[in-house]
Amino acid sequence: MVKIGNIELGEFPLLLAPMEDVSDPPFRAVCKSNGADLMYTEFISSEGLIRDAAKSVQKLDIFDYERPIGIQLFGSSIETMAECAKISTAAGPDLIDINYGCPVKQVACKGAGAALLQDIPKMVAMTKAVVEATHLPVTVKTRLGWDDSTKNIQEVAERLQDIGIKALTVHGRTRVQMYKGSADWSLIAKIKENPRINIPIFGNGDIDSPEKALEYKNTYGVDGIMIGRAAIGYPWIFNEIKHFLATGNHLNPPNLEERIKVCLQHLEFSIKWKGNHGGIVEMRRHYANYFKGLDHFKPFRSRLVTSPSFDEINVILNEVKAFYLNAEHVDA
């Protein structure tokens, strides 16, 4: 049984990665219903939260059906991060996660996210301040290092465990790599092989199929896997991996009707959370992913991303169903 503090996650948990502008409550809802064991909010700027910026505050929204769920924070100020840990604790999550892995320029160049991989003493001090600011378990997500010459994840794992984090997720690339090339899980495996390490270690990067999940589980010995981009428009990946790990057999992939059903559920959650206009606008980024692989889908997508109402979107999706099922443009 993998545990983070007192949170029981099963024998080999599958985590949904925190993704900016993606892993909001509606997206988390469809991932949870399709097998995600632990989820996180989008990462929240500590500076934005202190300023009471509306976007940052709204990211604190969590719902009981999502549990267990963590709030992920990032920032460059130790004091601000500690204060935001207190604010986040009051929002009622199951844990607090610190982002030391975001590679994007807007974050790293401000001394946050993956930038802390260049200043391990500050990373340790920041983590200690967050641990001391909350009664909740604190976890960390990071990368192998800043670049190929500074892959310091072994030191990071030991030092962060020593000051009290309860789990560590490692993306198998450096900051300089961004999302290019292949993720290197061999260094993640070395963390697990370290006799000093006793917290759960989760691997992240390039898991996009049940076969790869099984291969990486067996090869690298991690306690669980965090899935990010592969779940966008395809929340079924969690249950597909679980079924394959348990039986060695594949679940049937979702047919077109199932894709439409879950897409509409996602839209309904989005409208419920952000209102009619906001929910419809937020959903527009997801249609292409839900219907990836369909030939001739572009005209339908153009209508979906300009439609102003749920009813109209529902009509369009019914047209999608009729077009593809009747014309046999897709395996259903």
Language model: regions and residue ranges:
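Flavin-dependent oxidoreductase catalytic cores
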Residues: 1-332
